[in-house]
């Protein structure tokens, strides 16, 4: 209820009020759609509030897990919550230079993945990279010709300030470019529904 005290556009306030007034069945429907990566285009606003709540809850739960106990579940699946990655990042910190980590949009967990492998199907064949800017861009789309999906990849080795979830939204132009090219997004970010 504290969120109602925040300034927001009227449409957002109406969506928040609808979520707060929703009965248990409707809230379960919202949460099921968010957790299933299946947000209907005609009701994105209330789903965004539900997604924000899910992110906070999952991040709190993941923070309580013993990192050493986490084991790979499958390619492109978060070992903490089972969610899909929003993005992946090639790191540039000492000891993990040029190592790739996938970033979960649900719980914010980052986990190591093979650098040149599709996070959607696991293929190492037919991977390509596109960007809005230049070949030296720090945000690119890694697309797979095998499965027809793409996931955003950040080169934090070149730009350490990149954030895996916030800059996913901040690089919306790349989503538009890939959508217009007919390639399906493989990573999931509830704040980019429709792209």
Question: Where are the predicted features?
Answer:
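N-terminal alpha-helical interaction blocks
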Residues: 1-66
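Cys/His-clustered metal-coordination modules, chiefly Zn-binding fingers
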Residues: 56, 60-179
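Juxtamembrane/interfacial segments around transmembrane helices
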Residues: 153, 190-195
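C-terminal membrane-proximal segments flanking the terminal transmembrane helix
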Residues: 174-192
């Amino acid at each position: 209820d504290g969120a109602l005290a925040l300034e927001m556009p009227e449409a957002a306030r109406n969506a928040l009020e609808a979520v707060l007034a929703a009965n248990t069945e409707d809230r379960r429907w919202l949460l099921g759609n968010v957790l299933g990566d299946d947000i209907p285009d005609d009701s994105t606003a209330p789903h965004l509030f539900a997604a924000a709540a899910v992110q906070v809850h999952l991040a709190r739960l993941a923070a309580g897990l013993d990192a050493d106990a986490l084991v790979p579940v499958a390619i492109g699946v978060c070992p903490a919550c089972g969610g899909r990655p929003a993005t992946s990042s090639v790191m540039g910190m000492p000891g993990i230079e040029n190592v790739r980590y996938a970033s979960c949009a649900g719980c914010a967990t980052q986990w190591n993945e093979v650098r040149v492998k599709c996070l959607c199907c696991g293929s190492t064949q037919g991977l390509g990279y596109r960007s809005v800017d230049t070949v030296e861009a720090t945000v690119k789309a890694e697309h797979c010709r095998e499965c027809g999906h793409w996931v955003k990849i950040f080169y934090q080795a070149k730009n350490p300030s990149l954030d895996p979830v916030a800059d996913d939204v901040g690089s919306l132009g790349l989503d538009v470019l890939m959508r217009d090219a007919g390639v399906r997004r493989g990573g999931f970010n509830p704040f980019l529904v429709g792209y």
